[in-house]
């Protein structure tokens, strides 16, 4: 749906006859720069067609006569809203616009932002009151001027200098005038306060300046807050009108400069104002000028007055005032029991009766005034703003169910803030720091019923009044024509909109959403001050006001609870799991701001672990951030250590240009390694930078220099064959590119950065993975042994109980035959049992022998480093025996002739960890024949058993040759060649009998 606000034709195309007020209202929505032209007519036609299509006509080319009712209905709705808007004062309009803007999506908000900026520029340049506007803006943020104004208000005594009222605020004529009801004259002269004849005029001045307060101006904000207690007391004494104080409360409750601590202190005085209005409505106090009964409501049967300025008042402000006053008196009527909760404790919509509207409208007599307001006000149900209030009543105000409904400006603003009520009212609970509603969102039907004031005037079908049982009595129709309370107009059907509200905000003033963990099982409350005297209340308020001295300009950041004097013990005990774990989520750190180059300030502060001070930079420009000094940080409440660290980091930001220039020059000349350059880029990528296209001298364009260095580094990695392509350097560089893609400064170059990252990823994949590092021989604690220590035979466990060196086999597949006793085995060579011959160096079988060999036991021969490593080979035997391998083998067989000669077999493939079950008997890798004995294939025998085993055909010639050579070989040379005996003697301590395992 689009608003046809282009020309007069757009507004009058569906409305045949309108009053002058309607025409003027529609004209105010038109642009003020040009008259209707052909271009405007074409644009109007397009807007009308689009609006028709959005209203339910799916065919844009349909007959225009068919779309006439839809256009007429839409234009009537716009006219109704415009008429209501005209009846409100400036504060009411501001609250309405604030609430409606929160329901728009981001594109619409940006469009309105551009429109507002354009209108402000045009009005400031062409308006005749531009000088006065500038003066008001300056005074609104001038603490000296505001302090003088506050002193004048506190020390003022009413006088009769009515001629001094001519210099009061510019909007004084549009506000209600109560001069005839307030003429307490004294003989005192006003002197320097003659410009402010009454306190009411000072409040008018404050009301004009309060919206212009800039967030971060702590001194001015404290002066505004100090005025509230005095103004509320004057309202109770009937010195100033209630409406002015309500409007000031409205601005303060929605102002971005007000923190949650400030709202807690404001709620104390808001409670007193509410009690005063309730007591005045019930007739418990003397009625003042703004609580006189209205002739219209008295004639209608109401027992209480509406409180208009005068019966003949016709201005829009007077009508609005009458509406606010009449709505504030509703609880005093006969049907007061129909609403048991006030505006802070409204029940959710799922717990209401569906026919509540019709039931209230059927009321008569004294209950009519209350029934006319309830149908509109009940649409406030289910409103919980996660960004401004928590589920445990963050404002800490606990009200009873019998409190009255504070309508008007305060009701609307308070409802938008979600000011909590009693402990028994339906709140939301927390799940992992996210608030979840206890009730269903507001349904579309109820939202459509009362989302606008036009719903009480005309239906959706044609704009005619509803003619059924739900139609209000005739004496209430004029009341319904008056604008209802703010909350009833603004807050219908917004429960389902907060998903969009929490994500997008206007002008970054409410971008710091509520992220602290909610206390799901406890309700935070503060002690009630209503039963105490006024002096005690003032003391509590002063303490609460002083609680904002630390980091005052951090407008929306909830402060952590401490044991300071301003925090009450009850709040500390009820704080629950208030740990702020979810306070700095990514969507909070990267807030949306219109200041160029400042969107990434949160990530930079997070990298410095100073993200708790992110609120300090929310409204700063890039240039202002670079000018921050340590003294300034300490003056605003930053701790000494944090201010020193932050000031140093800001000074380093100014040196980024020189650093990038130096890195660029050293990379081009080859004086810097790539890893060093990548490290410098890592330190800069998270810092705030302006976009490349931002105006300014080239030497201050940090983003452009940053991209130049990245280009040099990546080109070097891709093209230079001598560049060290380290996997770690590539990974860090890809991380830098990833952070640059999401940086505000490189948004227009994201595609190029993505392509570059893709090329680097392919290069990283194509790199050869790192191989296992091999230690050289003779280096290290193991003397060059690169094998695992647990496989070293010397480190295996031995049987220490029996005193033997027999290794304990702990594996499941260990051969138990190694542990049995061999005393029963006969042996034909008893002289070998008492000798332990030393191993022969040239026959080192997997480390069983001595010498310089470091090969571990039980290693598989398939590993090339075992037998093929020349550094680990045993020294060769003497030259006289180096070429006698066949003769040596025959001598071995002669020594061990009690072993049978088996056919040569190929060793099976087995895992290296199972080799401890085998004993290999071989002459080395170069032997022509190897005797391999496997379990179960051999028998124990002696010299006489050879004839029974079927020797091979070549066994006899070998034995004969051995007998011939046996006489010439000494016993000393033959004894080391008993390899089988050497193996057995090293593994088992003292053998009486020889054995073999087959």
Curated annotation (Swiss-Prot):
Modified-residue entries (Phosphoserine), positions? 564, 575, 971
**Positions of region (Disordered):** 1-45, 50-69, 329-370, 773-892, 943-977
Every SAM domain range = 600-654
The UniProt entry's GO biological process terms, in alphabetical order, are:
negative regulation of translation; nuclear-transcribed mRNA poly(A) tail shortening; regulation of DNA-templated transcription
Q: Which InterPro entries match?
A: ARM-type_fold, PHAT_dom, PHAT_dom_sf, SAM, SAM/pointed_sf, SMAUG/VTS1_RNA-bind, Smaug_SAM
Give positions of region: Interaction with cup: 583-763
Q: Which GO terms describe its molecular function?
A: mRNA binding; translation repressor activity
Q: Where in the cell is it found?
A: Cytoplasm
Highest taxon of source = Eukaryota
Pfam families under this entry?
PHAT, SAM_1
Instruction: Give the compositionally biased regions (Polar residues).
Output: 1-37, 801-822, 854-864
Q: Which keywords does this Swiss-Prot/TrEMBL entry list? A: Cytoplasm, Developmental protein, Phosphoprotein, Repressor, RNA-binding, Translation regulation
Subcellular location, principal: cytoplasm
Q: Which stretches are tagged as biased composition: Low complexity?
A: 329-338
Q: Which GO terms describe its cellular component?
A: cytoplasm; P-body
Q: What is known of its domains?
A: The SAM domain mediates the association with the 3'-UTR of specific mRNAs.
Entry function: Translation regulator that binds to the 3'-UTR of specific mRNAs such as nanos (nos) and prevent their translation. Prevents translation of unlocalized nos in the bulk cytoplasm via the recruitment of cup.
Subunit structure comment from the entry: Interacts with oskar (osk). Binds to the 3'-UTR of nos. Interacts with cup, which in turn recruits eIF4-E, leading to an indirect interaction between smg and eIF4-E that prevents mRNA translation.
Q: Which family does it belong to?
A: Belongs to the SMAUG family.
* Protein name as catalogued: Protein Smaug
Query: What organism is listed for this UniProt entry?
Result: Drosophila sechellia
